[in-house]
Amino acid sequence: MVVLSKLISSILFASLVSAAVIERQATSINQAFTSHGKKYFGTASDQRLLQNSQNEAIVRKDFGQLTPENSMKWDATEPSRGSFNFAGADFLVNYAKQNGMKVRGHTLVWHSQLPSWVSAITDKNTLTSVLKNHITTVMTRYKGQIYHWDVVNEIFNEDGSLRDSVFSRVLGEDFVRIAFETARSVDPSAKLYINDYNLDSASYGKTQGMVSHVKKWLAAGIPIDGIGSQTHLALTALASSGVSEVAITELDIAGASSQDYVNVVNACLGVPKCVGITVWGVSDKDSWRSSSSPLLFDSNYQPKAAYNAIIAAL
C-alpha cells in the first residue's frame, strides 16, 4: 500500500511537472511580461534572420517588439548622399505589422556604421542639412509605424563627456537639439530616445553625464521622451532625469545566467517608467558575440534555463 501510494505520488508529481513544462512552452515571454503592465518584451532581428524558419517561429511566438539589428543604420539606409535604400528595413517593419509587433527605430544618428561621405563633412551648414534630410526621409517613410526611435545613439564617453564624432566636432552638442527637434516635427507620435551602453551604476561617470545632459536638454525644451540603456543597473537614476520613460534596449548576458536575466526582468518591473526589454537576438548561433552564449535560446534554437527562469518569475 505504501509502495502504491509512493507510485501514485510520483505519477502525480511527474504530471504536474509535465503540465508546468507544457504551460511554459505555451506561454509567450511577451505576453507574460506585458501582463505586468509593461509595453513589450522584444528582440533584435533583420530580414536574413526572419527568413530563417526556426528563428522566425520563435520571434513570432515569444516577442512583441522588433529592433532592426542593422537595416535602419545610416550605412544601410543612405550609403551615398541622397540615395536611400529601405529594402531591409521595409521587410522588418512589414513583418512586425503583420504580426502585431511594435518596432524600435534603430538608429538615426550614430558615430559608427556611418558612410565615409558623412564623416568627411566639415561644414556646419552642410552637416545640418544632411542630418535633417536623413532623419526626415527615414522617419517619414515609417511615420506612424514606429513606437520609439533611437534618435541619437552612444554619444557619450565613459567619463560622461560628449564622444568625439563628426557630429560633435562640426556642430558641438547642438546636433542633439537638431536631431530631436527634426524627429519630433516628422513624427509627433513616436517616442524619441537617447540610447547608450555601460550605464551600469548611478555613480558612474557615464551615467551621471547622461542624466545631467538630459536634464539640461529637457530644460531647454529638447523633446527627449526616453533613455535607452543596454543594461539594467541604473534604471532608477536614468528615470530621475525627467524623461517620461526608460527601456532596456540591447540586452545580452555572457553565459546567460538565469539569475542575471531574472534580475533584469525584475529591475524593469520595479521601475514604473521602464516600458520594456529588448534582447539583442534570439539564438546564440546568430549573436554578435556567440562564443559567450549570451541569449535565451541556444545554437539549436532551444530555450535555455534563463528562458524558463524568466517565465517562472513572471
UniProtKB/Swiss-Prot annotation:
The keyword Hydrolase applies. It is found in: Secreted. Its EC number is 3.2.1.8. PROSITE patterns: GH10_2. Induction: Expressed in presence of xylan and repressed by glucose. The active site is at residues 154, 250. Disulfide bonds join 268-274. Pathway: Glycan degradation; xylan degradation. Its main location: secreted. Keywords: Carbohydrate metabolism, Disulfide bond, Glycosidase, Hydrolase, Polysaccharide degradation, Secreted, Signal, Xylan degradation. SUPFAM superfamilies: (Trans)glycosidases (SSF51445). Residues 23-313 form the GH10 domain. GO terms for biological process: xylan catabolic process. The keyword Disulfide bond applies. InterPro entries: GH10, GH10_dom, Glycoside_hydrolase_SF. It catalyses: Endohydrolysis of (1->4)-beta-D-xylosidic linkages in xylans. GO terms for cellular component: extracellular region. Pfam families: Glyco_hydro_10 (PF00331). Residues 1-19 form the signal peptide. Belongs to the glycosyl hydrolase 10 (cellulase F) family. Endo-1,4-beta-xylanase involved in the hydrolysis of xylan, a major structural heterogeneous polysaccharide found in plant biomass representing the second most abundant polysaccharide in the biosphere, after cellulose. This is Probable endo-1,4-beta-xylanase C. The gene is xlnC.
